[in-house]
């Protein structure tokens, strides 16, 4: 058993603007005092299959950690929407919270995130709809996803638990564990029902009345936004995409709660005072968060 056990994690709001900051409240039980503390990093992951374009939203160190129950918060910045291409903006993505002890990853918390726009079904804005890939390409993507899953499984051989959802009831072991990739695929396969329920209803109406109705609704929804943008210098926030007028400040995201949680076995060894290396006076201190 590790030194730290996650009891619960909460996000301040599961539905918000993509440009709004986030706050996570975490509760742990610490079985042995951790003097050197642990580090947490919050990442906005644009592609569940790659971390190449991840954005770091927060990076903190919590130290020291006393034995017993502890609780702390992580304040994370909003992702920079200007660094996200529009054809990769909408649909399913993820926010990750990674915990490390002396560089060793011991916990990985993944929130599946659905990014959409008010009044427009996400499927109308997603990259797959724009490119209309052939069946052969779709089959190839499914094979690639399976290959990625197998690779992740082999790399994470030391994983203690492939998926543990928020530990609210320790006796409830009926649900089958899922990997983060499986959770994303489940949401995608059921969605195409998107997490925005209102969007799903509008998508059904679209099949009856045609896409022109969406354009009309979208123009009405964004009329004041568009007029305001034309009369100001903030035109960069309003763009035309897939036949719709998109205001980047109005883009929404919804976090699926509870998150998918992966635990990893690591070596929890505290250095003795004689083995500790003194900090160089010229080194800038790491950002720490006090635990009360």
Curated annotation (Swiss-Prot):
The keyword Iron does not apply. Residues 189-199, 217-226 have a biased composition (Basic and acidic residues). Pfam families: ASF1_hist_chap (PF04729). SUPFAM superfamilies: ASF1-like. Residues 131-159, 227-239 have a biased composition (Acidic residues). Signal peptide: none annotated. GO terms for cellular component: chromatin; nucleus. PANTHER family: ANTI-SILENCING PROTEIN 1 (PTHR12040), HISTONE CHAPERONE ASF1 (PTHR12040:SF0). Interacts with histone H3 and histone H4. This is Histone chaperone ASF1. It comes from Encephalitozoon cuniculi (strain GB-M1). The lineage of its organism: Eukaryota, Fungi, Fungi incertae sedis, Microsporidia, Unikaryonidae. The gene is ASF1.
